[in-house]
């Protein structure tokens, strides 16, 4: 059927007429019915609704005109050498729908295997293409490009101070001017890059990786406070988060080719990013738009025709809730591990003081060495707390934000569907208005009504194409996201287990070395 913006008329899709077809197939088309014994006219009137009628041709001539299905992805007919002409198309199973101005035409079982245009195929009984096969055929998104963020540097004093990060890029891709280059970027530049990419790609269904969240308290400490351990820890956390964010951007094939990304990596100086502050006018407008979108989403009642999207959206929502709970537990673990490290350090100091005041030489030496062991264990606890944070907590935090972006892609698809439905409703109203004008015999307004109908028919076709396109993009993006998520979690969990194993091995070595000292106490 002529839906979905294929724009092709029925005559453009019709194959040549086929001789030797049975009379009852001709009658189903709605053309003129020939005499029962008139074998010379068979096949001439099978497509009377077409723009032109071809002369009868021999079966061999027809077979030479049509593409042959040789097992490739091209559509065609299966030609068998020893098969009779009347059985030439016996294996065909797809029905060909012919659109015509006559509403009483019926579907005729086609004798050829004909592929409908993409927009029409979505509305036919033909099954959706296997995106699992598409996933296997796609090449891995591997690019010879590595980005690193180092050397956070505080520039300026007071509340006007900011931190600049060195962004280093190494690549052999020809789209860049050199193979190795470095630039200085501040945090607002990273936020500005995300805003540009999100504005261009999110509306098309792409999953744009989000930057790390702002931290007003942490940045205020850096600006007005002295360089202490808490400020250094905050800067290291932000540096690592920005590096992960930028690496996800350049790993995405669509984002990497964006000129804003290349400019961010190469250009020495960038224009100051505006609207990235939370309390700015643009920031307040974004908050208002988010609230408006949330309300409008509640009013959309989408008739989901593809169960895949419904199931995936439920999976994403459930996974986001579970990750939030797990992230809260891991943060508690990090805090307890840090508290354990502090208490172990206090314990080591107390043991050292006790050993220095002990009269028994062997006991004093054993207590002093036990204090040294506890100091080493305190370092192990501190390192493991950092591993808990950077390998687990930050990974979970990243994917909580990423899942929110995935949900936003589904919401964008829903908004595109709603726009299509609204256009269909408007088109129906325009047609009803035209009918009323015809009934009221008002020819002066009739032409304007016809023009409006043509305009809205074009909009409906375009919006349907947009919906089909964003559905394809969202499906591909979700498949790609799941592959990346599995790879990230596997790598981080393995690395985390290796740190735990190393920590326990070191702990065992410390106690094995101390055991002879304890036994030597007399």
UniProtKB/Swiss-Prot annotation:
The keyword Protein transport applies. The modification N6-acetyllysine is found at residue 237. Residues 281-298 are annotated as: Membrane-binding amphipathic helix. Residues 143-272 form the PX domain. The modification Phosphothreonine is found at residues 41, 48. The keyword Protease does not apply. A 1,2-diacyl-sn-glycero-3-phospho-(1D-myo-inositol-3-phosphate) binds at residues 186, 188, 214, 238. It is a peripheral membrane protein. The modification Phosphoserine is found at residues 32, 39, 58, 72, 188, 280. InterPro entries: AH/BAR_dom_sf, PX_dom, PX_dom_sf, PX_SNX1, SNX1_BAR, Sorting_nexin_N, Vps5_C. Residues 35-45, 132-142 have a biased composition (Acidic residues). CDD domains: BAR_SNX1, PX_SNX1. Gene3D superfamilies: Arfaptin homology (AH) domain/BAR domain, Phox-like domain. It is found in: Endosome membrane; Golgi apparatus, trans-Golgi network membrane; Early endosome membrane; Cell projection, Lamellipodium. One of its GO terms (molecular function) is phosphatidylinositol binding. Binds phosphatidylinositol 3-phosphate (PtdIns-(3)P) and phosphatidylinositol 3,5-bisphosphate (PtdIns-(3,5)P2) in liposome-based assays. Can bind PtdIns(3,4,5)P3 in protein:lipid overlay assays, but not in liposome-based assays. Involved in several stages of intracellular trafficking. Interacts with membranes containing phosphatidylinositol 3-phosphate (PtdIns(3P)) or phosphatidylinositol 3,5-bisphosphate (PtdIns(3,5)P2). Acts in part as component of the retromer membrane-deforming SNX-BAR subcomplex. The SNX-BAR retromer mediates retrograde transport of cargo proteins from endosomes to the trans-Golgi network (TGN) and is involved in endosome-to-plasma membrane transport for cargo protein recycling. Belongs to the sorting nexin family. Predominantly forms heterodimers with BAR domain-containing sorting nexins SNX5, SNX6 and SNX32; can self-associate to form homodimers. The heterodimers are proposed to self-assemble into helical arrays on the membrane to stabilize and expand local membrane curvature underlying endosomal tubule formation. The BAR domain is able to sense membrane curvature upon dimerization. Membrane remodeling seems to implicate insertion of a N-terminal amphipathic helix (AH) in the membrane. This is Sorting nexin-1. The gene is SNX1.
């Amino acid at each position: 059927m002529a839906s979905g913006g294929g724009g092709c008329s029925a005559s453009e899709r019709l194959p040549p007429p086929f001789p030797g077809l049975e009379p009852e197939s001709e009658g189903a088309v709605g053309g003129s019915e020939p005499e029962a014994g008139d074998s010379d006219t068979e096949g001439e009137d099978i497509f009377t609704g077409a723009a032109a009628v071809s002369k009868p041709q021999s079966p061999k001539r027809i077979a030479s005109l049509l593409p042959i299905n040789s097992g490739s992805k091209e559509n065609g007919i299966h030609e068998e050498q020893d098969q009779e002409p009347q059985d030439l198309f016996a294996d065909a199973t797809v029905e060909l729908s012919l659109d015509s101005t006559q509403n009483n035409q019926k579907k005729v079982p086609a004798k050829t295997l004909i592929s409908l245009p993409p927009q029409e195929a979505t509305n036919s009984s033909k099954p959706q293409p296997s995106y699992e096969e598409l996933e296997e055929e796609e090449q891995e998104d591997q690019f010879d490009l590595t980005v690193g963020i180092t050397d956070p540097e505080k520039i300026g004093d007071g509340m006007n101070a900011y931190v600049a990060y060195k962004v280093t890029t190494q690549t052999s891709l020809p789209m860049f001017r050199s193979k190795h280059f470095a630039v200085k970027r501040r945090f607002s530049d990273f936020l500005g890059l995300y805003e540009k990419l999100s504005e261009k790609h999110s509306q098309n269904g792409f999953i744009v990786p989000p930057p790390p969240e702002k931290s007003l308290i942490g940045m205020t400490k850096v600006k007005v406070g002295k360089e202490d351990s808490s400020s250094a820890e905050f800067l290291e956390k932000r540096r690592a988060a920005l590096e992960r964010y930028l690496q996800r951007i350049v790993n995405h094939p669509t984002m990497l080719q964006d000129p804003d990304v290349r400019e961010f990596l190469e250009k020495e100086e960038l224009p100051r990013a505006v609207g990235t502050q939370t309390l700015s006018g643009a920031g307040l407008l974004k908050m208002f738009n988010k609230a408006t979108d949330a309300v409008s989403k509640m009013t959309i009642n989408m008739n989901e025709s593809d169960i895949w999207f419904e199931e995936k959206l439920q999976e994403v929502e459930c996974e986001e809730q579970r990750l939030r709970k797990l992230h809260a537990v891991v943060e508690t673990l990090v805090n307890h591990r840090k508290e354990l490290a502090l208490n172990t350090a206090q314990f080591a100091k107390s043991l050292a003081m006790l050993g220095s005041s002990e009269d028994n030489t062997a006991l004093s030496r054993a207590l002093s060495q036990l204090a040294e062991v506890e100091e080493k264990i305190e370092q192990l606890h501190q390192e493991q707390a950092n591993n808990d944070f950077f390998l687990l907590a930050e990974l979970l935090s990243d994917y909580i934000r990423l899942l929110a972006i995935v949900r936003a892609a589904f919401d964008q698809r829903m908004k595109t569907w709603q726009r299509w439905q609204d256009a269909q409703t408007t088109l129906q109203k325009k047609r009803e208005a035209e009918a009323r004008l015809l009934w009221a015999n008002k020819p002066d307004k009739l032409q304007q009504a016809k023009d409006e109908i043509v305009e809205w028919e074009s909009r409906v076709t375009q919006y349907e194409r947009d919906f089909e396109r964003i559905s394809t993009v969202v499906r591909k993006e979700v498949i790609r996201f799941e592959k990346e998520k599995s790879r990230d979690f596997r790598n981080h969990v393995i690395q985390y287990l290796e740190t735990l194993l190393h920590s326990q091995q070191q702990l065992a070595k410390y106690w094995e070395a101390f055991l002879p000292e304890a036994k030597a106490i007399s």
